[in-house]
Amino acid sequence: DLNHNFLVNELGDNYHSTVETAKSLLADFPDKIHLPVDLAANIEDNRVDLLIDDLPVEAPLIDLGIQSTIAVSTAIKSAGTIILNGPAGVFELPDFSLGTIEILNACAESDAYAVMGGGHTATLVTKYGLASKMGHVSTGGGASLDYIAGRTLPGIASLEASAKQFAVEITKPVDPQ
């Protein structure tokens, strides 16, 4: 299956562990994880929304379906905090940008604190004039998620190490002679 092969190629050696982690999280938090009910396939350069039950298909699945987009947008509107990392679909193709644009609009309309992460997301939020309605916009997608998860970021670690190393020299009184 085309979409399965795409995931295997993207995740490489991490494919099986990622699938197992996803299954475990879904089992542990079934009321917190919303899976799509439909997806948009690119069939002969046309958007065709397909129910999950109609899968698999030998066509790229490159956006959320309309029903899933509505469900995600509704969930966003009642959220207290939103962390979004990356577009929902292949937004460069107008027919497959619907999920992304609607989700960004829902984030902007929500009263929640919204963190937008990733270069594509930051570009789109700016393009559609939504940046001022978000709590934070960062071009660092994976780095933003790592920071939120409490992981050490190499750049921050280097700055902290540098501050420790040079703090003594910076704060020493200078001898006027």
Q: What do the PLM-derived regions correspond to, one by one?
A:
Residues D1-Q177:
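Active-site loop-to-helix "anion-binding N-cap" substructures in soluble metabolic enzymes
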